[in-house]
Curated annotation (Swiss-Prot):
WD repeats lie at residues 15-54, 68-108, 115-154, 157-196, 218-261, 267-325, 329-370. It is found in: Nucleus. GO terms for cellular component: chromatin; HIR complex; nucleus. It comes from the Eukaryota. Residues 419-476 are annotated as: Disordered. This is Protein HIR1. It comes from Phaeosphaeria nodorum (strain SN15 / ATCC MYA-4574 / FGSC 10173). Pfam families: Beta-prop_CAF1B_HIR1, Hira, HIRA_B. Belongs to the WD repeat HIR1 family.
Amino acid sequence: MHLIKPQWLTHPGDLKDFEVYSCHVSPDGSRLVTAAGDGYVRIWSIDAILNSHDPEYKKPKQLAAVSHHSGTIHAVRFSSNGKYLASGADDKIKGTGTNEAPPVENWRVIRRLIGHDNDVQDLGWSADSSILVSVGLDSKVVVWSGHSFEKLKTLSNHQSHVKGITFDPANKYFATASDDRTIKVYRFNSPPPNATQQDQVNNFVLEHTITTPFLTSPLTTYFRRCSWSPDGAHIAAANATNGPVSSVAILDRGTWDGQPSQTSLIGHEGPVEVTAFSPRLFYQQQPRVEHDGNIHQPTVTVVACAGQDKCLSIWNTVLARPFMMTQELAAKSITDMAWAPDGEKLFATSLDGGILTMVFEPGELGFPASLAENEKTLSKFGAGRRVGIIEGTDALLLEESSKSGELKGVQGRMGALMGDGGAVQPPITNGANGIVPSTTLTNGSSSTAPAAAPAPAPAPAPAPAPAPAPAEPPVDQRVEKLKQRVTVTKEGKKRIAPMLVSSSSGVGTSSLPQTQLISAKTTSGARSDNPHNILDLSKPYDGFPKGGLASMLIGNKRKFAEIEGDEDRQVERRLAASVRPGGAAVVLNSESGLIPPAAAASKSNDVAEPSKVLRPAIISPSLSVSQVRLAVPKVRSVITRTADGSEPQRNGVDANTGKAEIPDTVMLEARNATGHSRTGRAQDHDPAKISCTSKGQPLWQDFLPKSVLLVTGNTNFFAAACEDGSIYAWSPAGRRTLNAMVLDAQPVIMDCRGWWLMCISAVGMCHIWNLKTMSAPHPPISLAPILDIAAHTQGPHLTRSPGIVFARLNSAGCIVVAMSNGEGYVYNSSMYIWQRISEPWWSVGSQYWNTTDSSVSNIRSSQDKAAPKEKDDQVSIENISAGIIPALERNTTNQFLLQGRAFYLQRLIKALISAEGYETFESSVSVAHLENRVAAAKTLGAREEFKIYLSMYVKRLGAEGLKGKIEELLRSLTGDLIVEEDEESGEQQEEIICGWKREELLKEAVLILGKHRDLQRITVPYARLLGIVTEDQRQDEQAMITDM
């Protein structure tokens, strides 16, 4: 053995050489890379090192010096294919370089991988370079894609610093060593180049935890660099102990035994920090080729060990003692070792700044076996084979069909990202083609309206178009138009407005998922308000106060001690205090609806005739004894509502003609009495005047004996609610279509959609009627369950409950309510129960929350052909309930962030994920969230969303490998396609699920699952049933195999 240590082979400093922490050899054996405390990654020529004694050698010694870290570099590793070089440092960043510019040694950083919260201690590449794994002092094991360098998974199973990583040469496992005195072995399947974090949720699973050899191991080592033998059968674990003695534990593959009977390498006086197996197998004797052309001699492996005792030992599997032991090889601890690919050159680094090279004579370690012998040995562990075996031609054909459909989807998304395709489809809103308005409308109010009218939730309200909108011009024409846009400055000079690069792109929203908890108000362009999106919800004109409509209740939850009596009339005094400062939120009624007093004061300056608040509404006696009490609107002087739900436009003057501009919108106006009583008695006030106008001309008018609190209407009818609880309805021509309907308390919310009319009273009762059929789908229902009445304590005191952000209707008469605590509810009229559709729990626990996947965010009508023109508050059958689930989830995000609870719940979830027993928490919550979405879409009858969410759910089940759920889901989609003999023939299932044929949904699910070979025993029978795999295809496949 020759020891080579050139003087120039260092990381020089001003006073002394820097400590060298890591080294590695390139797969071609030509380069040595070292990393040290100077923040440099230096690449050396191995040929120059071996010829350092030759003064005639003139070739470059140092090939490159790369400095892209701000601190000490602890680990540096070449990828197995030699294409990349990864380095990890105490700046918690891994830089990846590439040598794709031969023949000059030009190493450039192509990606900075940020994922650790503390120092990165070690790195490792898989045998096929498909993944890079980093470990650090933050106790994390982070898996990165070796192709895209996206983070695939973070493993938080360790409880202390992780200081070593090694990969199985058979490419099935990797092992990590930690200061929690364990080695954890993880099983993985090599991910494809286009793998994403969501695809790999069921990959990289913990296989085994080894603790026995490390129970008394010291925690003073800087590294715990273990190594996997080239035959894949053993792991050499550093910093183990055998009784009181430091040792290297040899762990057996498969059993992972850490028992006292295991093999231990004993001889070092201090803890061993690094072990390194030679990458080659060796014969002890000169190999002899037998008559069959093979070599039948046994092979041995060679392992080098070093650590804090500054000694280096080399062992093989035959000798009980090291066949080489060096004393005082370095002045300080040896930190890393690396073998050359030929297995006969060893490089070592130490904290004294030394970089050592040991060259062994031929036969000194043994006689190297060929690389084919390595592959032959590893083949028994499945090296070179993909997990899962095709079980017949049907499974192969199903897999090909699945991948073909997936490829088409990828090509379509890439085409969208690159701006391919023809003319853009005209926007389809609420089932009818329309022209995109210049301003975004929310609940009938323009985004340019004063801030005094808060909108409870986003809802598009595009203006109806008299004719179908023309197709948009090609992308290049739109770009030219943007380039030529001229603006006028304050000084009157004309200039061409600068154009953002992003504004000229014809590319739509990216279809790549980006899941994060963000407020919809902070997203660019207010994507939730985009008129291209379909939202099947009514557009109430009267807004809600900030924080939602105030509600108070007396809970159902009983206390341990009952409080009897209310002699001091505390209930009445608390109710009166609710309108004073310090009580419940006080809101004023203006012409624009319910607004805060401060906003009303600022708005009064620019309104000619503001709507005055005359007085509070008369309180119904039922309100004082009700468990639920909602804030009652005050009596306003003027209340208006347009037929299309848009913001009422005030009369203006045309700047060009000087003539008055009169809006042509049909508008209902209610004017309550403002003067004094004509008889002298307060109760003898003038009647309320109801008038309907269009283009400034009266269409009809009527009078009501009581003051009006709320009005609503559309193209089918108008309605007004009075302070005595009565509701009146008129046809568009002014006919009273039914007698006055009397409620049990004052109305606080009234809304309409199509022929449906909804009214919520002050005692929390929700009424809904169909004015076309003069019927109700269900009896009046109470809002008490969704106001958390079951969680509040029963007693004489009123309790503040969550406010109502909005209560609206869809075109099918389904009631949708959003709360200020972030929860969203829908009333199921078939089951007579409230169902929670959205809640903050999903926002921090699910990986699918707030996804920007275009298939979820921009749900558009499936009808590309021009549909007949429909009324503004109607949608086509395909778009019933469209957009309701995303709207409720956006409200959840906004309210959750507004209250500040997101930060603390996210901390709780982060702590749970790393806790024992919660390893599958994030995965389970994500699957449950998708199941919740699928069930919600089915309940609402949201056709497009149901198919999208079902597809996402099936993909996740396939990635998780949940065979039980998959089989149950496929069977539920089958319906009557398969009938068991013991099933009753009279019970038949519907062929349609949420507007889709069962066979179509089943076929899509089978094609999605077809690429998972471990699920093909479940999916192949369904593929045969659906005709995805036909007899002709099987014969063609068999003929092809025969020809081969």
